[in-house]
């Protein structure tokens, strides 16, 4: 019999009820092409931390100067300050201190093209809107016009050549004059103001603008001020926090206010589909305090949707700290037969903010602001999380070999792709749902090696090792398997586990 790993993590069902390829544990693996591939490691952009706080905002901006030169800038927000990054030295320099922002903010931004140049507008909900136009003086500046005296814009969007702003903790939004993001043309109150407020603008298919409130979703109709009108899409869902939404495919994934689960939104109420309720039940593992909810972030990078959040067991059970410490990840191009994601859990990457660097020579790299220290991290350049081993664990479904007979398991074959260094991975098997450590062995995942100088190179592209079960722990009628590893420098892909079983005798019921 053959067990593959194509089904994703399912934590809401008993192991014996899981379907083909589903796993009761899948930690620090990505599911790709029907196999498990260890998640890439992280390495610091700035080896010297800015301090003991995290970084909730990372931005790579691209600008075209008058002489045609392309300028790339790295920006981070840390403890109220805006910093510029030096890609060569891996250091940060504080921008003009007169432009410092409120502490404990989570900045939001949009970019507007003006005369061929990109201008970044940044909002916190506590400060005046700041802008950065790629100037050679490395300065963020206060805006002019109506924005010079406005402190409560929390997020924004460019739509129909206008800047649209959300007023913090309010149902009021403002929109600018055409091609003039710093002067407000008018304001609109969306829905009822009592017990509700706007959280985030997004732009969907057909240049349709949506406003997610905390308890409802609205769509904008019309293309000129005289036609602008917001119509309710649904009042059964709302957005839990301003970073809890991300464009994915033909719609958006968002964190719902009411049950704290992820949903897909395609533009109508009937298009809304649950993404985590059936298999993950996010509300059971995520810290549900509003501070923790405000810290979530989402992104799509190289075909994988990633959702950073704080585990509710932070500070215990091996989940560190009072900060984002986990991610839920799935391959958006490889859904399950039901259309739902095949989730895996990433633990230890400690992500507070995402940033994809994808223009003018940047190689579509993912960088993240750490949630526990003042560093930003390159992803997929190393095999570990900033020098810390990545703890990998996968546990299969409970497979019934025979419904009415005891079987003898004669051998197990783990098939995978080895790494380039000599490592072992702990292999366990569990009989009849008894999760003990009796049936365990160490499996080498290095393959055969030849020494070339001081570098060991794997000389086989595949391992398919047979493991013999313990003789007095080889009879039962169901079995599951676990692989575990927590060593530095490990690389591995796992394709399947096969086992051979022979029926021995019928199961006898006992009565007392």
Place the predicted regions along the sequence by residue.
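Beta-sheet repeat architectures centered on beta-propellers
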Residues: 1-91, 100-119, 236-252, 256-258, ...
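Beta-propeller and closely related beta-pinwheel folds
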Residues: 46-55, 96-104, 138-259, 263-295
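Short strand-coil-strand connectors
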Residues: 79, 125-126, 168, 214, ...
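Hydrophobic or amphipathic alpha-helical targeting/insertion segments
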Residues: 109-143
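Glycine/Thr-rich phosphate-binding loops of Rossmann-like dinucleotide-binding domains
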Residues: 130, 173, 376
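Generic macromolecular interface patches on structured domains
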Residues: 130, 226-227, 422
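Short, glycine/charged-enriched secondary-structure capping and boundary segments
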Residues: 135-136, 178-179, 377, 381-382
């Amino acid at each position: 019999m053959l067990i593959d790993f194509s089904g994703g993590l399912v934590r809401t069902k008993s192991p014996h009820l899981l379907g083909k390829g589903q796993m009761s544990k899948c930690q620090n693996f990505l599911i790709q092409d029907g196999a498990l591939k260890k998640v890439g490691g992280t390495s610091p952009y700035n080896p010297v931390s800015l301090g003991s706080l995290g970084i909730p905002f990372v931005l790579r901006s691209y600008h075209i100067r008058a002489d045609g030169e392309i300028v790339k800038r790295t920006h981070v927000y840390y403890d109220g300050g805006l910093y510029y990054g030096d890609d060569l030295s891996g250091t940060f320099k504080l921008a003009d201190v007169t432009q410092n922002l409120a502490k404990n903010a989570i900045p939001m931004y949009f970019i507007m093209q003006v005369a061929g140049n990109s201008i970044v507008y940044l909002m916190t909900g506590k400060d005046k809107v700041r802008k950065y136009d790629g100037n050679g003086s490395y300065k963020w500046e206060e805006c002019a016009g109506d924005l010079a005296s406005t402190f409560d814009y929390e997020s924004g969007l460019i739509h129909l050549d206008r800047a649209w702003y959300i007023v913090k903790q309010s149902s009021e939004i403002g929109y600018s004059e055409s091609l003039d993001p710093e002067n407000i043309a008018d304001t609109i109150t969306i829905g009822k103001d009592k017990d509700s407020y706007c959280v985030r603008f997004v732009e969907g298919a057909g240049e349709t603008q949506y406003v997610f409130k905390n308890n409802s979703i609205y769509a904008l109709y019309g293309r000129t001020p005289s036609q602008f009108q917001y119509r309710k899409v649904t009042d059964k869902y709302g957005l839990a926090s301003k970073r809890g939404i991300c464009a994915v495919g033909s719609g958006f994934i968002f964190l719902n206010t009411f049950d704290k689960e992820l949903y897909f939104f395609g533009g109508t109420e009937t298009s809304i589909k649950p993404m985590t309720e059936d298999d993950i039940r996010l509300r059971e593992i995520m810290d549900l305090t509003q501070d923790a909810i405000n810290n979530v972030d989402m992104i799509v990078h190289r075909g994988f949707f990633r959702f950073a959040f704080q585990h509710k067991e932070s500070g215990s059970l091996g989940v560190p700290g009072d900060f984002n410490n986990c991610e839920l990840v799935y391959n958006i191009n490889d859904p399950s037969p039901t259309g739902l994601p095949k989730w895996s859990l990433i633990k230890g990457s400690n992500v507070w903010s995402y940033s994809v660097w994808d223009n003018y020579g940047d190689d579509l790299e993912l960088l993240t602001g750490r949630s526990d220290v003042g560093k930003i991290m390159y992803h997929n350049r190393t095999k570990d999380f900033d020098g810390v081993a990545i703890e990998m664990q996968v546990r299969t479904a409970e497979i019934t070999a025979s419904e009415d007979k005891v079987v003898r398991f004669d051998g197990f074959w783990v098939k995978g792709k080895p790494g380039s260094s000599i490592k072992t991975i702990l292999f366990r098997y569990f009989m009849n749902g008894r999760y003990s450590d009796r049936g365990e062995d160490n499996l080498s995942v290095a393959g055969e090696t030849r020494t070339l100088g001081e570098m060991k190179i794997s000389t086989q592209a595949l391992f398919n090792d047979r493991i013999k079960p313990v003789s007095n722990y080889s009879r039962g009628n169901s079995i599951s398997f676990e692989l575990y590893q927590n060593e530095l420098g490990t690389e591995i892909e796992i394709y399947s586990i096969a086992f051979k079983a022979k029926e021995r005798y019928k199961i006898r019921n006992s009565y007392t």
